[in-house]
A protein has these predicted regions:
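Extracellular, cysteine-rich, disulfide-stabilized repeat modules with beta-strand cores
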Residues: 434-450
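Disulfide-stabilized extracellular ectodomains of secreted/luminal proteins, especially beta-rich
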Residues: 1-405, 409-417, 425, 448, ...
């Protein structure tokens, strides 16, 4: 198996991996530094983050909590010291990169200052003249939920639920006023009965134009938020999965057909993957009755241009309950795409917008191994297992560079590059190449090679 590995600095506790898109280079974000890793010439360069406001001696007190690649070498970063948060832009192409807030990020910088970002929280940046940052806060405190920072800061309403967020997805509506943010999370089940599940899986949705309610009722809090359970299981065997672990998104040309691949576990040591579309999620939010509530006449289900003008009696309805009675079912009301007795920790999916090619899933195991899984029209199966590390390890993140078919896997101590289109391993005969059923490989007439338009000739000539 073709692989390369580069160690991370000893003091580097990884936060995220970002693909640079050329020359086999990735950026590994740690607590204190960014590290540029070049797998072509196996070199690494450590980049300090000079936070602009504190004195140089205070820089080391800030931990990086948000890293987002805006364009080319321009990165948006946030860091916290446990009391306040700073955000800035860094141009990594500069000889000595500076950490300065750009004009369209200034509202984020000003509104987020007193907020403390927790490590590993999902976020989404809307990069525009009036940029907004959406970020979650997980835990059991009364202030958990989705936050919006920018020109109009919005916070979640207070509640007593324990929630842990695993993903945020921005909608791509043609009309900006209809754009939404979807968050996926698991919630501690308050029903502690003998047959009750410990966790419940949810999707929640807010509108990006939401400005909060009127004075005294949901002021500066979400008025557009609605929540729905995610269902994942085998109806015939009563085998259900409710602990949401991770999600990843495959975008479609028609936004409603965008697919969410959700990784679940259950209390019996099994994992499962269920797939949902934005269209099916939206259908529940548009049509389902609200849970434990009478008909809520006048309550908006679409985004409202000015939420501060919503009538007070409607705001009180929203404040009382935002959960739907019906659950979101997987695509075509199917069961899990995949379920087995492995403990998976992360999911990454490579799919085509129009499903022209088989979908490939990469799933990390709790021992550091990676499963490569193929999904075709009839079934889903594991076609390869990779061992990127020489020892048992916790996988921090997995990222695929689709053009090169290179998979980057990070642990707390190193980043490994795997060639997941290493087709020569299937031998030098057409039959062996085709029997491998690897969507990244095909027979070009002489050898098993990474798939191109000229390869993948399924029918083999008789000898």
């Amino acid at each position: 198996m073709a692989m390369k590995r580069l160690p991370l600095p000893r003091h580097h506790v990884p936060v995220e991996i970002i693909l640079e898109g050329e020359h086999e280079t990735v950026i590994a974000a740690g607590h204190k530094h960014l590290t540029s890793l070049n797998f072509q010439n196996t070199t690494s360069v450590e980049i300090s983050v000079p936070w602009s406001e504190p004195r140089p001696s205070e820089d080391r007190n800030f931990n990086i909590t948000v890293v987002h690649k805006r364009e080319a070498d321009m990165f948006f970063l946030c860091g916290t010291n446990g009391m306040k948060t700073l955000c800035c832009d860094m141009n990594l192409s500069e000889q000595t990169p500076r950490c300065l807030p750009s004009e369209n990020m200034r509202n984020i910088k000003d509104s987020i200052r007193e907020f403390v970002i927790k490590e590993g929280e999902p976020f989404a940046l809307v990069d525009s003249p009036d940029s907004d940052l959406y970020i979650t806060y997980s835990g059991s405190r009364e202030n958990v939920g989705i936050y919006k920072f920018g020109k109009n800061r919005i916070a979640p309403g207070r509640h007593s639920k324990e929630q842990h967020y695993v993903g945020l997805v921005l909608s791509r509506e043609k009309e900006p006023d209809k754009s939404k943010v979807y968050a996926f999370y698991r919630e501690k089940n308050k029903d502690q009965g003998m047959y009750s599940e410990m966790w419940l899986a949810f999707v929640t949705r807010v509108c990006t134009v939401d400005r909060g309610g009127s004075k005294n009722i949901l002021q500066f809090s979400w008025t557009s938020q609605m929540n729905a359970r995610l269902s994942c299981g085998h109806a015939d065997s009563r085998q259900h999965f409710s602990e949401l672990v991770d999600v990843t998104t495959v975008h479609a040309e028609q936004w409603e057909q965008t697919r969410i691949y959700a990784l679940f576990r259950n209390e019996w040591g099994m994992s499962a993957v269920c797939v949902y579309t934005i269209e099916d999620i939206e259908q529940i939010f548009k049509t389902s009755p609200f849970k434990d509530a009478d008909e809520q006449t006048g309550r908006p289900r679409e985004c409202v241009a000015d939420s501060t003008k919503i009538q007070k009696n409607v705001l009180k309805m929203i404040q009382m309950n935002s959960e739907m009675k019906e659950s979101v079912q997987p695509v075509d009301n199917s069961g899990p795409l995949l379920s087995n007795h492995h403990l998976y920790t992360h999911i990454h999916v490579h799919g085509s917008p129009n499903n022209r090619h088989p979908t490939v899933l990469f799933l990390s195991l709790n021992n550091g191994a990676i499963h490569k899984v193929m999904q075709d029209e009839s079934r889903t199966f594991v076609i390869a297992e990779y061992q990127p590390f020489n020892h048992r390890a916790h996988v921090v993140s997995i990222r695929l560079d689709p053009p090169s078919r290179k998979l980057y896997v990070s642990s707390r101590t190193e980043v490994v590059q795997l060639n997941v289109a290493n087709c020569s391993q299937y031998g030098d005969s057409c039959e062996l190449c085709v029997l491998a059923r690897d969507p990244y490989c095909g027979w070009d007439g002489t050898r098993c090679t990474p798939e191109t338009d000229a390869s993948n000739v399924v029918k083999c000539s008789s000898p």
